[in-house]
Design a protein with these regions (language model features):
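Compositional signal for N-terminal targeting/processing segments
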Residues: 1-201
């Protein structure tokens, strides 16, 4: 499993900013000890079918794209988000759009993502107990509604109860923009990493 960071990755920029300004930071996605175990554990036929249905359903942002006259979600996101000169005003709009998508297309959220989001909320609650004045969350747009509207703690605990675990080891590996591209086979890749590097600068 690889977690590639490019210079323009929001997570990497957040880490660098935190280090430079002596601000506590932490990863809050589901740890690999659980994530890898969930991938290797035998799932029930129903869970397997659900995951397959999510994959077959495609990119939920395609719905927004088609409504706005774009051919696909990738080109819509590129134009409306990545090239926006003043990105701050788009966050609320994206949250509202994704909230509507998740309500209308509940099948697009996989069982594994529901577990991940329960863990994210657990980490947010832990940070809130430390009485930080402000907490900044860097995550994918699809997860925003699930982190904004927090369910009961016991509901999340039920989702996380009895998660399987495996031993893991981590290391730093040099990574190229070719590997970050979709064409490399990287599922969460982007179309043209070099282009985004140019935009960042």
């Amino acid at each position: 499993v690889f977690y590639p960071f490019a210079e323009f990755s929001p997570e990497w920029q957040a880490i660098r900013y935190a280090v430079q300004n002596r601000i506590p930071f932490r990863f809050f996605d589901l740890p690999l000890i659980y994530s890898l175990a969930l991938r290797t554990e035998k799932t029930s036929e129903q869970e397997t079918e659900t995951t397959a249905e999510v994959a077959e359903a495609g990119d939920p942002f395609d719905w927004l794209a088609h409504a706005a006259g774009f051919t696909d979600g990738e080109s819509w996101w590129e134009t409306m988000i990545e090239h926006r000169q003043e990105p701050a005003d788009i966050f609320q709009a994206v949250q509202e759009a994704v909230t509507a998508l998740r309500e209308e297309l509940p099948g697009h959220t996989s069982p594994r993502d529901l577990i991940r989001e329960a863990w994210m909320r657990k980490m947010i609650r832990a940070a809130q107990k430390e009485n930080f004045e402000r907490i900044v969350v860097v995550c994918g747009a699809w997860h925003v509604p699930a982190l904004d509207d927090m369910p009961k703690v016991k509901d999340d605990n039920e989702l996380l109860k009895g998660l399987p675990k495996v031993k893991v080891e981590c290391t730093w590996i040099p990574w190229t923009y070719d590997r970050l591209a979709f064409r490399s086979g990287y599922g969460a890749g982007i179309e043209s990493p070099g282009w985004y590097h140019y935009l960042w600068h």
